[in-house]
Amino acid sequence: MASEKDLLKASPNGREMLKDGRAPKAGEIMKNPTMGNTFKLLAKHGKKGFYEGEVAEQLVKVVQDLGGYLTLDDLKHHAETGTEPVDPISLKYTGQGVGERPDGGIELWEHPPNGQGIVALMALGIIQELEKQKKIPKWSLKDHNSTQYLHTVIEALRIAFCDAHWFVTDPNVVKVPSAELISESYLAERAKLFDQKKAISAPVHGSPAHLQSDTVYFCCSDPEGNAISFINSNYGGFGTAIIPKGCGFTLQNRGANFSLDKDHPNVLAPRKRPYHTIIPGLTTYINDGSLHSVYGVMGGFMQPQGHVQVLLNQEVFKLNPQAALDSPRFCIGAGMPSADGKMTDATIYLEEGIDEKVVEELRALGHNVKQLDGYGRGMFGRGQIIRRHVDDDVQVWSGGSDLRGDGAAVPL
């Protein structure tokens, strides 16, 4: 109902994405012919069919009619810079005995800033450094979702988010030191913040975890070992809920992730890209660089947290792709910062299925814990995995699709 009202309120074209002016009921067939026309234009003209021509004209018109500032020249500029090819960033993970395997371990590849994939890389690197510093033991299978395991991964992600909150922005406008942030020396230094006996007391410069998102992730592979990891999102719910007339889609609201602090690298500015949450993931084997998996976890700021948890579930705790996704997860949430930049609240959300004793022990370590069940579990994201391995020179594929969502793993 909330989304229905948002669509009708946001622009005069809200009925285009509703059925007779209302949200479709369960089981009803919903048609969106105007979106079909937009897809035809994209198929014929590529991205020019979106950033130029009738779609672009309607997009600019609805924004200007509602008092916004957008021109056709802005869209043309974004088509050139906002869709440019980028080089991925990566981190080799060999911790917890993973590097002792014949394949040498795995390398996780993420989209670089302005995306938040660097959070997953930093967190994995910090966990790896903690093991080298002998601050954490080598985990056994029974340690999965134990108090010490969850405390370690939670704290590593909190440290990583602290840095990302400051550094992640548009690299075409402000230099982002990605290589330095995931360097072994820097991560070893950051790992020194970890305390086995209590949660870090320093403020965590995270961002609020969104209970709703309008994200779609899919992955696919072929028999030759080629694969695609793809993600797209309008951000919160239906984004702005503003619909360009005759186009069948809503405009995104990614600008919500800019900072309004004039001294912040991610400060709002014209023709600048904000901190971005959507991140497709891909892993390769270290020894030969061949494909290990393609995967992703939809869900706003849950995404790098999901990447880390799902990857560790497979590599350290030997879970298959479906079991790795089914396993209960945690999500670090955060209140908005106060005027002095300190966080007013930092909550660790735990999914039903995590042992009650573990919940209480995490509270004793100083974590502000809240348990979620039912529909609240949507906070923990919705993931998809395609996994490849070679057994006796035979290529074997497996897949998993998150029970929290409505996807499927389908062999063709």
Please give the residue ranges for each predicted region:
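Short, small/polar residue-rich loop motifs at catalytic or cofactor-binding pockets
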Residues: 85, 212-215, 276-278
